[in-house]
């Protein structure tokens, strides 16, 4: 590898300025915004259920700090919905946007923030993936993978709210974290094969986030998931992507597999669930301990088979075959394997995914 090959292009590290993680602290949201930028008006983007549950407490906290607000409801992540909300937010003339809810609301706020050049804060009510602190957003469009938007200026988490969300969501977050060990291995491979930049620090940060699940899964199986640890690990994973300047530390072949399933079987399984199942198979291709991943996912209550999330054998096989074609510029272990129908079926069966 030449000196020039190993030299990366400069990139900007856009990081959250302030992250607050507390318990039963949603009534401090107004103070959080005030300390962050002293906004006069904030556009609040959330789903119908989240708005119904949190509206009273959030509005009270904003009024205490004399912050005006306008609510907007995000029903799906279709481009048409996003465009509608963006037009409404533009009319608000707010100086802050807040995404309050699951991945959809946070992603919507993130992309609108980027398009309108207005800072935004992430207020996750579920910990199902690492998007709460990353600059990447997933919307239904012609792009087969996440797109770059903007990192949140701040992240505000009430662990009590996270705990009240369905346990399946937290287990999905564990699946997204476990995927980091696949992504980092793929990133190392890409660096070796193409000379692309490899950020040791961001890779280690992503790995540390994954190990919080892998090393503690037996304890979680016995005592239940530790919501705070998992939330903080997901935030750290998102920050790792901010530092890397790309999704590389948290997104490898397992994410390509998940994106392929999004196209083949939309609506089947949560993002982290699909990444977890993908990690089992890709780990075997990489020569990693895939059985440990299976055990970890079972310990945290995440699915390990296609059937558990309503997928057929053919859908798993097809997703493995088309995964690498979705993002040909990203070097992963799938570049080393000419994935055929026979190979895909053998891989999925040998890992008991199908």
Swiss-Prot record:
Cross-referenced InterPro entries: G1P_dehydrogenase_arc (IPR023002), G1PDH (IPR032837), Glycerol_DH (IPR016205)
Residues noted as binding Zn(2+) in the record, renumbered to the chain: 176, 255, 271
Listed Pfam families: Fe-ADH_2 (PF13685)
Cofactor mode of binding and number, as noted: Binds 1 zinc ion per subunit.
Pathway: Membrane lipid metabolism; glycerophospholipid metabolism
Cofactor needs: Zn(2+)
Amino acids binding NAD(+): 103-107, 125-128, 134
GO biological process, one term: glycerophospholipid metabolic process
A molecular function (GO) term: metal ion binding
Catalyzed reaction equations: sn-glycerol 1-phosphate + NAD(+) = dihydroxyacetone phosphate + NADH + H(+); sn-glycerol 1-phosphate + NADP(+) = dihydroxyacetone phosphate + NADPH + H(+)
GO CC terms: cytoplasm
Enzyme class: oxidoreductase
Keywords of the record: Cytoplasm, Lipid biosynthesis, Lipid metabolism, Metal-binding, NAD, NADP, Oxidoreductase, Phospholipid biosynthesis, Phospholipid metabolism, Zinc
EC number(s) on file: 1.1.1.261
Annotated compartments: Cytoplasm
Top-level division of the source organism's lineage: Archaea
Binding site for substrate: 130, 176, 259
CDD domains in the record: Gro1PDH
Its biological purpose: Catalyzes the NAD(P)H-dependent reduction of dihydroxyacetonephosphate (DHAP or glycerone phosphate) to glycerol 1-phosphate (G1P). The G1P thus generated is used as the glycerophosphate backbone of phospholipids in the cellular membranes of Archaea.
The protein's assembly and partners: Homodimer.
Family: Belongs to the glycerol-1-phosphate dehydrogenase family.
Protein name: Glycerol-1-phosphate dehydrogenase [NAD(P)+]
Species the sequence originates in: Nitrosopumilus maritimus (strain SCM1)
Gene, per the UniProt record: egsA
